[in-house]
Swiss-Prot record:
SUPFAM superfamilies hit by this protein: Nucleotide-diphospho-sugar transferases
Biological role: Transfers a GMP moiety from GTP to Mo-molybdopterin (Mo-MPT) cofactor (Moco or molybdenum cofactor) to form Mo-molybdopterin guanine dinucleotide (Mo-MGD) cofactor.
Transmembrane portions of the chain: none
Documented EC number(s): 2.7.7.77
Binding, GTP: L14, A15, G16, K31, D104
Transferase found in the keyword field: yes
Record's subcellular location: Cytoplasm
Subunit organization: Monomer.
Positions contributing to Mg(2+) binding: D104
Taxonomic path: Bacteria, Pseudomonadati, Campylobacterota, Epsilonproteobacteria, Campylobacterales
Annotated GO biological process: bis(molybdopterin guanine dinucleotide)molybdenum biosynthetic process
Domain of life of the source: Bacteria
Name by which UniProt lists this protein: Molybdenum cofactor guanylyltransferase
């Protein structure tokens, strides 16, 4: 059955990170550009996959890539915090709600995303797996803009502080696996294995 497209909430793919722990052959690599599944890059995989669920998917990053897609460019070149991407997205898109997801969480199910997008009476609705809060796999309302501005002004880039000081709610999910974050090459290899296993049923 085809997924009904979410057309009233844009999805912003957060890809402005540092990849500091992602090392291949003793060299730091940009994980967004690592080949993934049958796609030339993780970026292309995530963008293509999310377009099956959202009418509008935009990539938030420091610079645009070869992939033909809409980009939101983060101007802060030497500072790495997802808060810049979230703040910039609200200023640019001028929309009440935005769903955010990091580039390096390719296993999050559409069911989980739909569950998060289905609750709209909080400022931040985020995913929580058995061991961890996932503040970046989340639906945000534009009424967080003042809190975002204040956090950036005071240089408090801790996402947990901001979320806990706004009307937020955690949605509990019992599958740890789907929230696997590809911080390292080992995580990346594990994700590839999981998808292979899923494909073979």
């Amino acid at each position: 059955m085809k997924n009904p497209i979410i057309d009233n909430i844009p999805c912003v793919l957060l890809a402005g990170g540092k990849s500091s722990r992602f090392i291949t052959n003793n060299i730091q690599a940009n994980k967004a550009l690592m080949p993934f599944e049958s796609y030339s890059s993780l970026l292309e995989y995530q963008y293509t996959r999310l377009l099956k669920l959202f009418k509008k998917v935009i990539i938030s990053t420091k610079k645009s890539y070869e992939l033909n897609a809409p980009y939101l460019l983060e101007r802060e070149s030497d500072l790495f915090s997802p808060l810049f991407g979230i703040h910039n997205a609200f200023l640019t898109l001028q929309t009440p709600y935005i769903f955010f997801i990091p580039i390096d969480t390719p296993l999050v199910s559409f069911e989980s995303i739909k569950a998060l997008c289905g609750i709209q009476n909080f400022s931040v609705i985020y995913a929580k797996s058995p061991t961890k809060e996932h503040y970046l796999i989340s639906l945000w309302h534009q009424n967080t803009l003042n809190a975002l501005c204040y956090a950036l002004k005071t240089q408090n880039y801790r996402l947990s502080d901001l979320v806990k000081n706004t009307p937020s709610i955690a949605i509990n999910f019992d599958q740890e696996e789907e929230f696997l974050n590809l911080n390292t090459l080992k995580d990346y290899e594990l994700a590839v294995q999981i998808l292979k296993k899923r494909a073979n049923g």
